[in-house]
A protein has these predicted regions:
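Charge-rich (acidic/polar
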Residues: 19-169
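Bacterial Sec-dependent N-terminal signal peptides
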Residues: 1-26
């Protein structure tokens, strides 16, 4: 029984990793899709992946993440616009605007862990960090270096903690 379970898990994990990652381009402006795919490809190119299929899958995971983030913010923006046009005032308006922000934050939190998990099917931890850094235009290094410049007395463990927090963010 144990052998069957192990073989089943190996088969399922192999099957899942062999699946192509589709680009979620339905109902999107073709120029926007082209722009996002191009931006995603630039990130993938820096990873030095040798397998074209893996590179395409990683590019699609990254592009789909950009699409997902855009969708989350578009929903938030539509709700904010609706609240502003509704005629609500005072505390009721503030509550409705806060609810829209809270829903956006919840959606971002729910999606936060799926992205590195999806990338981990194709990349190692160092490559995943390179993808995140590419998506944020190198903000981790810039922010980390700024912190070190502002607080030159940091101990090595404090530097490591700041770096870990920046990577997680």
């Amino acid at each position: 029984m144990k052998k069957i379970l192990i073989l089943s898990l190996l088969f399922i994990s192999g099957w899942m990793s062999a699946q192509a990652v589709d680009l979620n381009k339905e109902n999107r402006d073709p120029e926007y899709v082209k722009s996002i795919v191009s931006r995603s490809q630039k990130i993938v190119d820096k990873l030095g992946l040798t397998d074209a299929k893996t590179a395409e899958d990683v590019r699609n995971v990254i592009a789909n993440r950009y699409f997902e983030l855009n969708d989350i913010y578009e929903v938030r923006d539509a709700k904010v616009k609706k609240v502003k046009e509704s005629g609500l005032t005072g505390e009721a308006k503030n509550e409705a605007l806060k609810a829209a922000e809270d829903e956006k934050d919840a959606a971002l939190y729910r999606s936060h862990f799926a992205f590195p998990a999806n990338l981990s099917l194709f990349l190692d931890e160092k490559q995943i960090e390179a993808v995140k850094d590419g998506m944020t235009y190198g903000v981790v290094k810039v922010t980390y270096d700024s912190h070190l410049d502002m607080i030159p007395t940091l101990k090595e463990e404090e530097k490591a903690q700041i770096y870990a927090w920046l990577i997680e963010a």
